[in-house]
């Protein structure tokens, strides 16, 4: 499938999430404390190279960044299915994935779901494997049925934010160079999906 057609198949909610990520990520950066190295529109040089881009990252096109976000951070981890169930939870997962890798928010979602099923009374535990597949989506749909769409969304966003904050605190505690990024992560990544979006 050609890349333009693939992106054209993105839902309006997915495109809005990508636009929000661009707003947070900004343009070109090359912070010596960032192990990701040269980054443009939130895409690291290594990821750009995986997608066939060989030019200077200062010239990395926004259109290719959109495609990278859609393929690597929405389609591959299965977050397109999550966006269909709850755009706000989908945004939380995709945004977190861009910053921490897509497996990490998948695990946070799975841990949150397992903690909310009342010891399996509402739905079975899911395997915490970092792959948000059909069992994870079924568990989230069950949580929606039990708690209502808005409340399920608020509960998951809160628990994913809490885990993300803990992740950043561990990174900064283990490696003081990451402290450079803590203010930005705290301002732009924790609580950046307003609970009002769950309504």
Where are these regions (language model features)?
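Cell-wall polysaccharide-cleaving catalytic domain and substrate-binding groove, primarily
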Residues: 2-199
């Amino acid at each position: 499938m050609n890349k333009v057609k693939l992106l054209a198949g993105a839902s309006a909610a997915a495109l809005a999430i990508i636009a929000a990520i661009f707003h947070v990520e900004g343009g070109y950066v090359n912070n010596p404390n960032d192990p990701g190295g040269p980054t443009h529109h939130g895409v690291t040089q290594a990821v750009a190279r995986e997608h066939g881009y060989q030019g200077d990252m200062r010239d990395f096109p926004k259109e290719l960044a959109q495609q990278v976000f859609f393929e690597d951070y929405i389609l591959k981890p299965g977050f397109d299915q999550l966006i269909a169930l709850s755009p706000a939870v989908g945004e939380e997962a995709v945004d977190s994935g861009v910053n921490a890798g897509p497996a990490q928010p998948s695990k946070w979602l799975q841990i949150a779901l397992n903690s909310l099923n009342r010891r399996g009374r509402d739905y079975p535990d899911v395997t915490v494997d970092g792959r948000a597949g059909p069992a994870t989506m079924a568990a989230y749909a069950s949580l929606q049925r039990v708690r209502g769409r808005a409340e399920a969304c608020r509960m998951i966003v809160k628990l994913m934010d809490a885990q993300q904050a803990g992740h950043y605190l561990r990174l900064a505690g283990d490696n003081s160079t990451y402290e450079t990024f803590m203010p930005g992560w705290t301002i732009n990544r924790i609580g950046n999906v307003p609970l009002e979006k769950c309504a």
